[in-house]
Every structure is written in structure tokens, then in C-alpha cells.
Regions:
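Non-transmembrane, aqueous-exposed alpha-helical and coiled segments at domain scale
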Residues: 24-208, 212
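Short, Lys/Arg-enriched N-terminal segments with co-localized hydrophobic residues
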Residues: 10-24
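Single conserved hydrophobic/aromatic residue that forms the stacking wall/gate
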Residues: 1-11, 209-216
Length: 216
């Protein structure tokens, strides 16, 4: 019952009793510093007794090292917990989804005999585009001695676009093709203004962008 779950969750010292009485435990791991607190290692440890692992934000600029029976791994985009067959790993809508990097990281696991993990990606996750990485690099060069020391992974330009509402969500790849083309053209126009007048770099060429039929 709901009352049983509330009572047993208050009793933190008796998790087994909570589970026997039908209680569901949700654990949130949040870093309160500037990173490197050990979030990934803690998540990997808790994943052993969890059914679902959710990464809710961040991108491939982050990193955590996991050592297990398969070897030593440095994960950057995949959620901790991908090494457990019983878990489902979810990439949430706050994640900077670098699709080529995600595929590369999955392959790096299976190449070392790790079973293919069960992965779900939110259709509202926003896609990190190649020009985000380029803009990150250009901005660091422009700032020169006053640069922020970016990892040049495109994270700052990505989140700037996200909150300016000019990014691309996963669901848009499966929506109306004409609307997607029009949005791409509008975004390219905005980006080219910055490329030409602020960074003095080659412009984005819309004619080179090809939209393929997505695999469902």
C-alpha cells in the first residue's frame, strides 16, 4: 500500500523490508561541486540493485571510469549501469546527445565483449550538432588569453541553442520533413551571421545537408 511504502522509505536502515512490502526506492545522485565528485562510480555501484538508470543532463564532456570484470572503461555519454544485463539505461531530455559519439561508445563496449546494453533515448533529447563543436573551438580561439578552458565538446553552444529554442530534438527527425528543412535553413542563416562577422570562418553550406529517411 502507499502507506506501507511511505513508512518503509522513512526507515532507511531497512531497505530489504521496504522491497518485501512492495516499496519502490528512487535514488538521485547529484553533484554539488564542479564535477569529479565520483557520481559515476556511485551510480555504477547502485546500478547493481536497480532496474532503471537515468542520465538526465550533461554530455560527452563528462567522464567517469568504471573497472569491472570486462576491464577498465572511461564512459562519457552512456549512463553508468550499462554493464548490468538487468538494467535499462535511459538518456533523458536534458542530455546533449552526440549521436556519432553514442554509437562509438556503444561499439567500444561490444568490441570488448560487453553485452549490448538496453538503451532508451528520450524523443525530447536535443542533438549536439557538428557546428556546436566548431563554435566552441572558435570561441576559445577568439577569447585567446581570456578563454574558459573549454573541452571543445560543443557543450556551451549546445545549451545556448537549447534555451534559445533553435536546437533540434530527436522527435523532429521523425516529424514533417519540410518543417525540418525550413528550420535547418533558418538556423544556418543565424549561424552564418556569427561565422562571417564574429569568427571570420567558412559559412555553413545548406546545399550539402541531406535528409535521409529515418530508420524506425
Amino acid at each position: 500500500s502507499r502507506r506501507q511504502r511511505q513508512m518503509c522509505i522513512r526507515d532507511r536502515a531497512d531497505i530489504d523490508k521496504c522491497q518485501r512490502n512492495g516499496g519502490n526506492m528512487v535514488k538521485a545522485i547529484v553533484g554539488a561541486n564542479w564535477g569529479d565528485e565520483g557520481k559515476g562510480k556511485i551510480t555504477d555501484m547502485l546500478a547493481e540493485e536497480s532496474d532503471i538508470i537515468v542520465r538526465f543532463q550533461g554530455g560527452s564532456n563528462a567522464g567517469h571510469t568504471i573497472i569491472n570484470e570486462y576491464g577498465k572503461f572511461a564512459l562519457h555519454l552512456l549512463p553508468s549501469g550499462v554493464f548490468y544485463n538487468h538494467t535499462t539505461s535511459i538518456i533523458g531530455n536534458g542530455v546533449a546527445l552526440n549521436i556519432p559519439y553514442l554509437i562509438k561508445e556503444l561499439k567500444s563496449l561490444t568490441d570488448r565483449n560487453v553485452p549490448m546494453p538496453k538503451i532508451l533515448v528520450s524523443d525530447r533529447a536535443q542533438i549536439l550538432m557538428p557546428y556546436h563543436v566548431a563554435f566552441d573551438t572558435y570561441e576559445e580561439a577568439r577569447l585567446a588569453g581570456k578563454s574558459f578552458g573549454s573541452t571543445k565538446s560543443g557543450i556551451a553552444p549546445f545549451y545556448s541553442d537549447k534555451y534559445a529554442k533553435i536546437g533540434f530534438q530527436v522527435n523532429e527527425l521523425f516529424g514533417d520533413e519540410q518543417e525540418l528543412k525550413e528550420k535547418i535553413a533558418n538556423v544556418c542563416t543565424l549561424k552564418n551571421v556569427m561565422l562571417e562577422h564574429l569568427y571570420h570562418q567558412p559559412l555553413l553550406n545548406l546545399s550539402l545537408i541531406h535528409i535521409s529517411e529515418p530508420t524506425r
